[in-house]
């Protein structure tokens, strides 16, 4: 809730900013990242661990200009896979751990459920609601609908869970299909090109400035979010986070520490 997601977000941001100390102090960088990884595990969330690892690989490539060997990636992913599997076995005491991991593919089954139904296409209504309604606090709009965006699909396909106020299960591409129907590939191409242009822009700025705020935006544009929620395209929120990281760097008086957030190109 109000503490869970911000805590994960700050752990991710702290880990990414810690990467920028890697060249000066590997011990400090690794200590900060490991500490935040432990915090993330204590939240019961595994996805951000992969995000931190991939972000670090991208940091080495885009900031430190190092070549990443293929076998290093294979070994690293194997270690992380073993750790995550062990975490599943430890936290899920009921049933088979493999079956519990397989249940994470529910979004695929839900997408097929939507695609194989006679659901009337919404032509962008669900997307608009997810992007707009989700950002309006209920304190400001007391009559805000309960069934907007993916929640409307939950109401249609999983009414029992919806009326028990259990939220919306992940529908994957099913949510887009419910919106655009046969035009879904067209939307994916258009949105993909737009996001690709943004990713290229922030990639260039990251390599040019070697700074954390541009790096955070680059990560978001290629699919690595520091805000662990699934609803909506959180571009404005990531801009705000990147801006706060930039502002924080301007209040650091020591040039020895300042490179952590905003490197000097001298």
Which role fits each region the language model picked out?
Residues 28-38, 74-81, 189-193, 213-221:
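Central hydrophobic cores of alpha-helical transmembrane segments
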Residues 12-13, 19-21, 168-266:
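Hydrophobic alpha-helical segments
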Residues 1-5, 116, 176-178:
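Short aromatic-rich membrane-water interface segments that cap or initiate transmembrane helices
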Residues 1-67, 80-94:
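Membrane-embedded catalytic interface detector for glycan/lipid assembly enzymes
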Residues 70-148:
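Aromatic-rich transmembrane-lumenal/periplasmic boundary elements in polytopic membrane proteins
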Residues 127, 132-183:
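Long extracytoplasmic/lumenal interhelical loops at the membrane interface
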Residues 4-6, 23-31, 46, 50, ...:
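Structural motif marking the loop-to-transmembrane transition
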């Amino acid at each position: 809730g109000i503490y869970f997601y911000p805590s994960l977000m700050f752990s991710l941001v702290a880990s990414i900013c810690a990467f920028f100390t890697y060249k000066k102090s590997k011990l400090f960088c690794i200590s900060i990242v490991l500490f935040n990884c432990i915090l993330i595990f204590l939240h019961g969330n595994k996805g951000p661990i992969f995000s931190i690892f991939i972000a670090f690989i991208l940091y080495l490539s885009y900031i430190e200009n190092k070549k990443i060997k293929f076998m290093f990636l294979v070994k690293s992913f194997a270690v992380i896979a073993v750790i995550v599997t062990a975490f599943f076995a430890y936290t899920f005491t009921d049933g088979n751990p493999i079956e519990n991991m397989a249940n994470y593919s529910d979004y695929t089954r839900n997408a097929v459920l939507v695609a194989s139904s006679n659901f009337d296409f919404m032509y962008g209504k669900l997307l608009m609601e997810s992007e707009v309604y989700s950002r309006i606090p209920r304190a400001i709009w007391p009559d805000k609908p309960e069934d907007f965006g993916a929640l409307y699909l939950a109401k249609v396909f999983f009414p029992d869970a919806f009326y028990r106020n259990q939220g919306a299960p992940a529908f994957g591409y099913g949510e887009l299909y419910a919106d655009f129907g046969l035009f879904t590939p067209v939307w994916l191409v258009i949105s993909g090109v737009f996001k690709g242009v943004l990713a290229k822009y922030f990639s260039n700025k990251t390599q040019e400035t070697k700074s954390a705020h541009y790096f955070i935006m680059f990560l978001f544009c290629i699919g690595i979010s520091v805000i662990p929620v699934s609803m909506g395209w959180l571009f404005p929120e990531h801009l705000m986070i990147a801006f706060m990281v930039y502002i924080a760097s301007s209040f650091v008086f020591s040039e020895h520490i300042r490179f952590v957030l905003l490197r000097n190109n001298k």
